[in-house]
Amino acid sequence: MVPTGQVAEKQAYEEPRQDHELKSWRCLVFYLCFFGFMAQLRPGESFITPFLLERKFTKEQVTNEIIPMLPYSHLAVLVPVFLLTDYLRYKPVLVLQCLSFVCVWLLLLLGTSVVHMQLMEVFYSVTMAARIAYSSYIFSLVHPSRYQRMASYSRAAVLLGVFISSVLGQALVTVGHISTYTLNCVSLGFILFSLVLSLFLKRPKRSLFFNRSTLARGALPCELDQMHPGPDRPETRKLDRMLGTCRDSFLVRMLSELVENARQPQLRLWCLWWVFNSSGYYLITYYVHVLWRSTDSSLSYNGAVDAASTLLSAITSFSAGFLSIRWTLWSKLVIAGVIAIQASLVFCMFQIRDIWVCYVTFVLFRGAYQFLVPIATFQIASSLSKELCALVFGINTFLATALKTCITLVVSDKRGLGLQVRDQFRIYFIYFLMLSITCFAWAGLDGLRYCQRGRHQPLAQAQELRSPLETSVQAISLQDGDLRGPQPSAPQLLSEDGMEDDRGDLRVEAKA
């Protein structure tokens, strides 16, 4: 039994230490959120299309030569940047992202040829691939019990930065009557400031895959053999250790877990939604500003529309967290309904030649997509570990990028069909329409099977009737570190489609 004096002395030692850790954590959170906010302040981003057209680039060059370079280069750099992000422990990739933004705006301001603008797209693809570094970085520095709060803080900072940036850009153009060139110079100033901030970020000591702690890795069978060697011969023990290392390596275990979890219908469904819907979504955002320009070149409320769509996206994604339905039964029908709404909005965009209709339909289109993003995130993560969740999101992002690259090559690139922007939107309308019909048919078949049984389907998971928000709150109490344990509160390593990427949405809209 510990003497009372020693207990009091230990408590007196622990209390200042805990206060110091709490103060340090708060300072770190504030600095990270401030960096996330400042990194989004690029008010000229919503007006890049008018700027390019003022620089005497034609609509055909922007549509069929400049923009297609973005998905091509994004596909090329996505996997290397993803691996470097974890291997270098996040901070160097955040600095690289800021440097790439500097190169983007220098080329935008100083470039004079299509090749310069294509090179600008290459640098911007690096910034798109590096977005995962911020969302991964903030979770590597805090205890798992603070994941939920960190997700909300960082997400709020990013959304606020996107909203303020769009409002500021629109105000400077409409009220201040400044030129788009000056607006891009202001953006470059903000980017340089965010670059300075990135240099003072704290570098984590661990990461998710390559720099895992000893406790997270655990003792492998070969390590146990070394501690308790058997009577076998040295050569046999060495061979067994090598085979055990390969068999029980972290990557092999993750892949085996992925194959096992791929049998879950809900996981397959939402991964398919992520790949196919996000591809169409980003194709729309790539080219929507060109569509606006071709509809009415006298009005330019790009910043206001971006701000409104960001606000609506935040509202719809937040409200989705409180939606409580039986997802095993209704997922396909909800997805089909939302995609049908998206298809009708895309139809209105290219068919009704009114700029205000184009503005409103795009705001609604973006809000509809962001409504399903948090639902998909929690449905995918509901039975996956933190590491496996990151791997699945990475695979989904890669497949979505590959799909939109193929569509771009066929539809947009001058080496393919080279369609004008309005004809492209017809293709995208057919794309969403076919997705909707497929999901409705899929839901109908499930409904027929359900009716034939004449009884309720058993719930696949205990949290089926809960909302994603309730699911994530429950997951906070789960143990962090077991590869097989469900951890839906895992870091939101959303590469391109979650709310962490909202700034990227505005950029590709502006570039389009």
Curated annotation (Swiss-Prot):
Q: Gene3D superfamilies from the xrefs?
A: MFS general substrate transporter like domains (1.20.1250.20)
Q: Looking at the record's lineage, which domain of life comes first?
A: Eukaryota
Residues modified to N-acetylmethionine: M1
State if Metal-binding is listed as a keyword.
no
Q: Show the GO cellular component annotation of the record.
A: apical plasma membrane; basolateral plasma membrane; brush border membrane
Residues the record lists as Phosphoserine modifications: S467, S472, S477
Please verify whether the record's keywords include Acetylation. Answer: yes
Which stretches does the entry tag as region Disordered?
Answer: 478-512
Membrane-spanning parts: 30-50, 63-85, 90-110, 115-137, 152-176, 182-200, 267-292, 301-323, 330-350, 354-377, 392-415, 424-448
GO molecular function list: 2',3'-cyclic GMP-AMP binding; antiporter activity; folate:monoatomic anion antiporter activity; folic acid binding; folic acid transmembrane transporter activity; methotrexate transmembrane transporter activity
**Family recorded in the similarity comment:** Belongs to the reduced folate carrier (RFC) transporter (TC 2.A.48) family.
Which PANTHER family does the record match to this protein?
A: FOLATE TRANSPORTER (PTHR10686), REDUCED FOLATE TRANSPORTER (PTHR10686:SF12)
Cross-referenced NCBIfam families: rfc
This protein is called what?
Reduced folate transporter
Per the UniProt record, the source organism is Mus musculus
Instruction: Provide the gene name from the record.
Output: Slc19a1
